[in-house]
Amino acid sequence: MEEAKSQSLEEDFEGQATHTGPKGVINDWRKFKLESEDSDSVPPSKKEILRQMSSPQSRDNKDSKERFSRKMSIQEYELIHRDKEDENCLRKYRRQCMQDMHQKLSFGPRYGFVYELETGEQFLETIEKEQKITTIVVHIYEDGIKGCDALNSSFTCLAVEYPMVKFCKIKASNTGARDRFSSDVLPTLLVYKGGELISNFISVSEQFAEEFFAGDVESFLNEYGLLPERETHALDQTNMEEDIE
C-alpha cells in the first residue's frame, strides 16, 4: 500500500516537472508562476508577459529569440524585485514619519525639570495658561509625609525622560485649600490637559511598594495612558525593526 502510494506521488511529481536541466527548471518556475497567479487580479499585460516567459522556445527566428530573451529578463527582474522595492519604500516612509513626529515634538513645548509652584494662584495660572496640547502632572505633597520624598525624586527623573510633559509640585499648605489636602490623602497626583482635570489619585503611594522609584511611577501613569511615548524609544524601536528586516 505504502509503495503504491509512494510510486503514485513520484509519478505525479514527474508529470509536473517535465524539464530537468537548469533552463528546464527555470521554465518550470515560470510556468508555475503563471498558473499560480489569480486570473481576476492579474493585469492582462502581466499575464501575457508571464505566458511568453513560460515558453520562450516557441519562437523560431534566432535573432528574435535573443531579443525576446533579453526583454523577458528585464521584465522578469522587475516582477521579482517589485515586492522588495515596495518594502524598501515602506521602510523609508515609516522612517520619515518618525523623523517628522520627532521634529514636531522637538519644536513643541519642552520642560525637562520639575516646577515648584509657590502659591495657589501660580497653580491655577499654570493650569489655565499652559498650551492645550501639554500634559501637566502635579504632585501635591507635604514634608514628612510617607511617599512624598520618593515621588518628588521620581518626578525629577521623569521630567528628563518626558520633556514634553510639565511636571510640577506644590505643598498642600500653599494651595489655599489645605482642608482638601490633609495628610490622609497625601501624596496626591493631579493630571491636567487643556485646562481640564483628566485624572486624580489620592494617597497614590499606596499603589506602590514600600520603596518605589521613577520606573514604578512611569508604569503606573502609562497604565492610564497619561504619558506620551518617549521620543528616543520611538525612534530606536523603528530603527531596530528596520535592522531586523
UniProtKB/Swiss-Prot annotation:
Query: What is one GO biological process annotated to this record?
Result: visual perception
* Phosphoserine found at: 73
**What's the superkingdom here?**
Eukaryota
Domain Phosducin: start-end pairs: 1-241
Q: Where is this region: Disordered?
A: 1-68
> Which Gene3D superfamilies does the UniProt record give?
Glutaredoxin, Phosducin, domain 2
Where is the segment annotated Thioredoxin fold?
A: 111-245
Q: A cellular component term (GO) from this record? A: photoreceptor inner segment
Check the record and name the InterPro entries matching this protein.
Phosducin, Phosducin-like_reg, Phosducin_N_dom_sf, Phosducin_thioredoxin-like_dom, Thioredoxin-like_sf
Compartments annotated for it: namely: Cytoplasm, Cytosol; Nucleus; Cell projection, Cilium, Photoreceptor outer segment; Photoreceptor inner segment
Entry keyword annotation includes Cytoplasm: yes
Q: Where is the composition biased (Acidic residues)?
A: 1-14
Q: Output compositional bias ranges, type Basic and acidic residues.
A: 59-68
Q: What about PTM?
A: Light-induced changes in cyclic nucleotide levels modulate the phosphorylation of this protein by cAMP kinase.
Q: Which UniProt keywords apply?
A: Cell projection, Cilium, Cytoplasm, Nucleus, Phosphoprotein, Sensory transduction, Vision
Which family does the record assign?
Belongs to the phosducin family.
Please describe the quaternary structure of this protein: Interacts with CRX. Forms a complex with the beta and gamma subunits of the GTP-binding protein, transducin.
- What job does this protein perform? Inhibits the transcriptional activation activity of the cone-rod homeobox CRX. May participate in the regulation of visual phototransduction or in the integration of photoreceptor metabolism.
What is the protein name for this chain? Phosducin
| Species for this entry | Felis catus
